[in-house]
């Protein structure tokens, strides 16, 4: 097995999220949000380039050499898929690889709000999944889609760049198109998506006005449309969407969003008491009041509306983190460090019955001890690069 494939296997064995290949540094691997070197071998440009070239073809090599950028994916049979981003830095090659496991986790196994099951079974509307890079957006969306796949007949259609999780046909037929492999570009794929009779559409990441407009149009035409967006929370997501459009188009945009948006799900991963990571989730359901705020452009009022919402399933990050603290999943310090408003979280801890019990040291569940051999401190068997392997690539 080549050196790069052995690295991929190591990522799977250690449940790592990323590896980093950079000149002048050893290979670094990230586990549970903590990056560490796997050995003390400093890499040079030939080594980094050789590792990359082991897993890309001649066409991809030419693209990288011509454009100095490459985004692609590699599947290792029985192990999983790996999202590869190659670039140049300080005149030298560099690579970041994200691990996408073979198995889509069951929705119930992720500790997510139960309302997500109801949301993914909706007939129409726009669902936005937002969060920072590495926050688990893709995993949560894949688990939600696979739950629909198990529960509903129909056609699930994805347009991704690249395809990440691989779905099996269950009750639904699932067709997955990859930009660059199955369609020439995102624009062409988006234009033709409605002609392929989908019931549920995943269009990957929204990066610009064109993608956003397509997502809204799909929802308006009676489809359930899912997409991801880089934003910290619902408020930032709405502001980012608005920023895609010129001032003269925003009134129409806000009217369309207020009518089509089903919910915004925001996620961030926080360190739990076992040394692993758990998802804190904000859910903004588009209630009648939220829809009115969106239509009026009063985005700054949404946070308070969510805090006071009587809509079952809606919750802010502070409410999600409070539940995790109360249930002994995370420490109070970890919760405060990840809250949008530490003051609001402290208020919940000190001014609710469950919070008062926690503050008095009466946690519902005692903190679990870290699992032995699990997490970022798990030992590595020594990984050495044979220079002859990379030189042959």
What are these regions (language model features)?
Residues 1-393:
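Short, flexible helix-loop junctions that flank or precede catalytic/ligand sites
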């Amino acid at each position: 097995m080549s050196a790069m494939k052995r690295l991929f296997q190591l990522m799977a064995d250690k449940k790592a999220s990323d590896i980093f290949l950079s000149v002048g540094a050893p290979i670094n691997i990230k586990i549970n949000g903590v990056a560490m070197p796997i050995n003390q071998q400093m890499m040079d440009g030939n080594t980094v380039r050789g590792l990359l070239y082991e897993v890309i073809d001649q066409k991809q090599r030419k693209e990288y050499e011509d454009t100095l950028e490459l985004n692609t994916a590699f599947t290792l049979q029985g192990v999983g898929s790996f999202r590869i981003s190659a670039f140049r830095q300080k005149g030298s090659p560099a690579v970041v690889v994200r691990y996408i496991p073979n198995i889509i986790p069951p929705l119930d196994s992720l500790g997510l709000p139960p309302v997500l099951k109801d949301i993914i079974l909706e007939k129409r509307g726009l669902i936005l999944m937002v969060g920072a890079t590495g926050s688990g957006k893709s995993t949560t969306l894949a688990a939600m889609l696979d739950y629909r796949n198990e529960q509903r007949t129909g056609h699930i259609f994805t347009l991704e760049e690249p395809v990440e999780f691989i779905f099996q046909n269950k009750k639904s037929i699932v067709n997955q198109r990859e930009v660059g492999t199955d369609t020439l570009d995102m624009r062409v794929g988006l234009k033709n998506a409605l002609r392929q009779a989908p019931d549920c559409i995943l269009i990957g990441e929204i990066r610009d006005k064109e993608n956003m407009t397509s997502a809204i149009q799909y929802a308006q035409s009676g489809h359930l449309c899912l997409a991801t967006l880089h934003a910290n929370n619902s408020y930032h997501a709405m502001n980012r969407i608005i920023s895609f459009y010129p001032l003269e188009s925003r009134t129409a945009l806000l009217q369309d969003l207020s009518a089509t948006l089903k919910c915004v799900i925001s996620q961030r991963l926080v360190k739990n008491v076992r040394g692993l990571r758990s998802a804190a989730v904000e859910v903004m359901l588009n209630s009648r009041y939220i829809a009115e705020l969106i239509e009026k452009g009063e985005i700054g009022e949404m946070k308070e509306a969510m805090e006071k919402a009587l809509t079952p399933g809606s919750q802010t990050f502070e409410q999600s983190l409070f539940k995790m603290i109360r249930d002994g999943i995370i420490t109070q310090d970890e919760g405060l460090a990840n809250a949008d408003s530490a003051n609001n979280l402290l208020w919940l801890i000190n001014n609710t019955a469950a919070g008062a019990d926690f503050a008095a040291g009466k946690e519902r569940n005692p903190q679990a001890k870290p699992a032995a051999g699990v997490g970022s401190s798990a030992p590595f068997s020594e990984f050495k690069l044979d220079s002859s392997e990379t030189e042959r690539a």
